[in-house]
Amino acid sequence: MEKDEELKLENVEISSYGSTDKGVSFLVELDNLSIFHAGDLNWWKWKKFNEKVQKREEREYKREVDKLMGKQIDIAFVPVDPRLEEHFYLAGEYFITEIRPALFVPIHFADNYDVTRFFKDRFNSNQTRVAEIAGPGEKILYTRK
């Protein structure tokens, strides 16, 4: 799929959104469950980027995420890339604040599992549960409220 396309396969609806790097991001809806996977859609605020490029990265990330406003997202997989150093949390914070998924699952953190603990400690709420991942192969159970 390319950006901004929709596909329906029996009871599964897939909508594609843009990325700020490679590929696309996806919203999958089935059986009254909605799952968003950001892929490489991230707020890439690299220290080596000048201010103009950093502002563009912010604008492009927010533009794609804002397309999800008004949609109920049950589960969201969003990058929290520690290579961005002190800016690693920006994409996740914006997504949680603006979209308010029921469950937020951090991705793109390699083996830096402390990042997931940081997110849980900082952003877990009655509105959005944040998954803390302790190691590879961990299972996360989602139940509706």
Language-model features, listed with the residues they occupy:
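Conserved acidic residues
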Residues: 74-77, 102
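Catalytic metal-binding/acid-base residues of hydrolase active sites
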Residues: 42, 79-83, 108-110
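Active-site glycine- and acidic-residue-rich loops that bind
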Residues: 19, 83-86
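Core dinuclear metal-dependent hydrolase active-site scaffold
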Residues: 1-72, 135-145
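A short, acidic, amphipathic alpha-helical segment used as a generic capping/interface helix at domain edges
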Residues: 61-66, 85-94
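Binuclear metal-ion centers of metallo-dependent hydrolases, dominated by the metallo-beta-lactamase
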Residues: 1-5, 88-145
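Conserved protein kinase catalytic core
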Residues: 46, 85, 114
